[in-house]
From Swiss-Prot:
GO terms for molecular function: translation elongation factor activity. Belongs to the elongation factor P family. One of its GO terms (biological process) is peptide biosynthetic process. GO terms for cellular component: cytoplasm. Involved in peptide bond synthesis. Stimulates efficient translation and peptide-bond synthesis on native or reconstituted 70S ribosomes in vitro. Probably functions indirectly by altering the affinity of the ribosome for aminoacyl-tRNA, thus increasing their reactivity as acceptors for peptidyl transferase. SMART domains: EFP (SM01185), Elong-fact-P_C (SM00841). This is Elongation factor P. It is found in: Cytoplasm. Keywords: Cytoplasm, Elongation factor, Protein biosynthesis. It comes from Dictyoglomus turgidum (strain DSM 6724 / Z-1310). Pathway: Protein biosynthesis; polypeptide chain elongation.
């Protein structure tokens, strides 16, 4: 059990039978009442983000998550196959377990597979990934009325805003936290 006063970003907790990671926390001191802790939590199984308020004297169970480096191999049906980089053991995760992470998965990418009580429950992506542009409008010279960006569909199906000079076939670096273009690869 861990006190809600000891929360920090990245801490994993168990709440109502689900595993959450703390994204943000804030101590709130009331003038006439008990202090509270407001937190922003992300469900590791579904990817949903919730906000919750705890009384400052509450305790919650801490979830101990193990991480193993693994390479993404392939997709078969709604199952995604990974191989451990050290033990060469294969892990199978479903589309539901991966959530939005599937938009960044490309065969050969290395990710961290998250384990809770010995079972794989999800993955942690690297901060950036390199993906190829497969569909985008041609950028016209001097056309900056639209803010200097245009939509581009990447090889995984993800659509992001890219600068006008990006063409089909270009490889771009994408920030996986915000689904944003970083630079040309």
């Amino acid at each position: 059990m861990i006190s809600v006063n000891d929360f920090y970003p990245g801490l994993t907790i168990e709440l109502e039978g689900e595993i959450y990671i703390v994204l943000e926390y804030q101590h709130v001191h009331m003038a006439q009442g008990q202090a509270t802790v407001r937190v922003k939590l992300k469900n590791l199984k579904t990817g949903n983000v919730i906000r919750k308020t705890f009384k400052s004297d509450e305790y919650v169970p801490q979830a101990f998550i193990n991480k193993r480096e693994a390479e993404y191999l392939y997709k078969q049906g709604d199952e995604y196959y990974f191989i451990d980089n050290e033990s060469f053991e294969q892990y199978i995760l479903t589309e539901e377990q991966l959530g939005d992470a599937i938009k960044y998965l490309k065969e050969g990418n290395t990710v961290s597979v998250l384990f809770y009580e010995g079972n794989p429950i999800g993955i942690e992506l690297p901060t950036t990934v390199v993906l190829e542009v497969v569909e985008t409008d041609p950028g016209l010279r001097g056309d900056t009325v639209s803010g200097g960006s245009k939509p581009a569909k990447l090889e995984t199906g993800l659509v992001i805003q890219v600068p006008l000079f990006i063409q089909i076939g270009d490889k771009v670096v994408v920030d996986t936290r915000y689904a944003k273009y970083v630079e040309r690869a």
